[in-house]
Swiss-Prot record:
This is Glutamyl-tRNA reductase. The lineage of its organism: Bacteria, Pseudomonadati, Campylobacterota, Epsilonproteobacteria, Campylobacterales. It catalyses: (S)-4-amino-5-oxopentanoate + tRNA(Glu) + NADP(+) = L-glutamyl-tRNA(Glu) + NADPH + H(+). Keywords: NADP, Oxidoreductase, Porphyrin biosynthesis. Pathway: Porphyrin-containing compound metabolism; protoporphyrin-IX biosynthesis; 5-aminolevulinate from L-glutamyl-tRNA(Glu): step 1/2. PROSITE patterns: GLUTR (PS00747). Its EC number is 1.2.1.70. GO terms for molecular function: glutamyl-tRNA reductase activity; NADP binding. It comes from Campylobacter jejuni subsp. jejuni serotype O:6 (strain 81116 / NCTC 11828). Possesses an unusual extended V-shaped dimeric structure with each monomer consisting of three distinct domains arranged along a curved 'spinal' alpha-helix. The N-terminal catalytic domain specifically recognizes the glutamate moiety of the substrate. The second domain is the NADPH-binding domain, and the third C-terminal domain is responsible for dimerization. GO terms for biological process: protoporphyrinogen IX biosynthetic process from glutamate. The record marks 97 as: Important for activity.
Length: 432
């Protein structure tokens, strides 16, 4: 069954999410290797962003305690706290949740489109490292299709919003950004988003980054309203400008009290990184906004999008039902094929016995074979038609299991692999 354990802005604070975050691929790979050794876990992947950690798996039976214990040991967190906080989804609930995540209905900012790329990256990593097979591939591919339908049939992603844009929106409430200079620390995806929104608001941006070439490349994409410098000069900029947006992947805070000088004007720091980049004291001239502090702005956007979200959830519900109908169809067709193949094998076997015992002349073999095959085809016609009529119906699972038992069919039916997942496992760059 499909299985999902979820830690998000809805059930954890930023301090806990910092500890759970997978800031590098080595940590993610280590965790997936650990949990994939469990006898009940067949496939798994991890989605890790500033607002969520999602463990998505295909399992034989529920194993939340093992997964959470493994996560707790790796991240040095109390297992009982994680079990208390975790949202756990099974089967249709897990698929509905995955589709909601992919469609940005579960995001801090509903309608933001970053999550699709983050899911794509998580999936590609799992496929590349052999943690993900046909079951999760089908689920993720269907999640992308659902997300596309939500975008195309609702207005929820029009004028897309991200945590970075919410931070800039908050800055615009505090001051007119036109002609001001804002410092963006970090040249990654979140830093680039913040810079784009700042430029759209009329500000000029300064990009600070450890890798100067990456900062230069970003400025070339941004255009004339940007410049760049090394992160080594951070202190100089911190004590020269008013607005700072920090979005690095540093494991610890990079902006601390030791770098801050007292100045006679207000400065605003927006920490949009997880783990947090900023650890300074606030006072009348220094204000710090972390991811969780942006909730008020987020709520305004949620109110505007409430109707679109209701429509989107309707789509997700229908797509979830359609996904399980699709799985039932995949299961039924191999059953039909296996029963017919079994009948053919028994008929051929009995024909050979009849020939050996002299019940039939060898010259009559082919005519007898045709007759026998016509008989079993006629006999199986009505069961085959009735099985096909079950496709997409609730009772199909019960019938499938009964047919497997009655005809002694193996769990991995011959022919199942012909139902190729739409995701090409050999070309995992063609995911989305």
């Amino acid at each position: 069954m499909y299985y999902c354990i979820s830690f998000t802005h809805k059930n954890t604070d930023i301090a806990l999410r910092e500890k759970l975050s997978f800031s590098n691929e080595a940590k993610k790979s280590e965790f997936l290797k650990i949990i994939s050794t469990h006898e009940n876990i067949e496939e798994c992947l991890v989605i890790s962003t500033c607002n969520r950690v999602e463990i998505v798996a295909f399992v034989k039976m529920a194993c939340a305690e093992f997964i959470v214990k493994s996560l707790a040991l790796l991240c040095d967190v109390d297992k009982d706290i994680l079990l208390e906080k975790a949202d756990i989804f099974e089967d249709s609930g897990a698929i509905h949740h995955l589709f909601s995540v992919a469609s940005s209905l579960d995001s801090l900012v509903v309608g933001e489109t970053q999550i699709a790329g983050q899911l794509k990256d998580a999936f590609a990593f799992a496929v590349k490292n052999n943690f993900c097979g046909v079951h999760l591939s089908r689920a993720v591919h269907s999640a992308f299709k659902c997300a596309a339908k939500v975008r195309n049939e609702t207005q929820i992603s029009k004028n897309p919003i991200s945590v970075a844009s919410v931070a800039v929106a908050k800055a615009k409430e505090l001051a007119d950004l036109a002609q001001k200079k804002a410092v963006v620390i970090g040249a990654g995806e979140m830093g680039e988003l913040a810079a784009k929104h700042l430029i759209a608001a009329g500000a000029k941006v300064i990009i600070l980054n450890r890798d100067l070439q990456k900062a230069k490349d970003l400025c070339e994409r941004l255009g004339v309203l940007s410049e760049y410098d090394s992160l080594e000069n951070l202190k100089k900029y911190l004590n020269q400008y008013e607005f700072f947006f920090s979005a690095t992947n540093a494991p610890n805070a990079i902006i601390t009290n030791s770098l801050i000088e007292e100045l006679p004007y207000k400065r605003y720091f927006f920490d949009i990184a997880v783990p947090r980049d900023i650890d300074i004291n606030e006072n009348e001239n220094i204000s710090v906004f972390a991811v969780d502090d942006l909730e008020n702005v987020v709520q305004k956007n949620l109110a505007l999008r409430e109707q679109e979200a209701r429509m989107a959830y309707g789509i997700i519900g229908r797509e979830t039902s359609e996904f399980f109908r699709y799985l039932n169809d995949l299961a039924l067709m191999p059953i039909i094929k296996a029963i017919r193949l079994q009948a053919k094998e028994y008929a051929d076997k009995q024909l050979e016995i009849a020939l050996k015992k002299g019940y039939l002349k060898k010259s009559d073999k082919e005519e007898a074979r045709k007759l026998i095959h016509q008989v079993f085809k006629a006999f199986l016609h009505t069961p085959t038609v009735n099985l096909k009529h079950l496709q997409g119906k609730m009772q199909s699972d019960t019938v499938i299991n009964a047919m497997r038992y009655v005809f002694d069919l193996q769990n991995n039916l011959e022919g199942l692999n012909q139902y190729k997942c739409e995701f090409d496992m050999e070309n995992n760059d063609e995911i989305y």
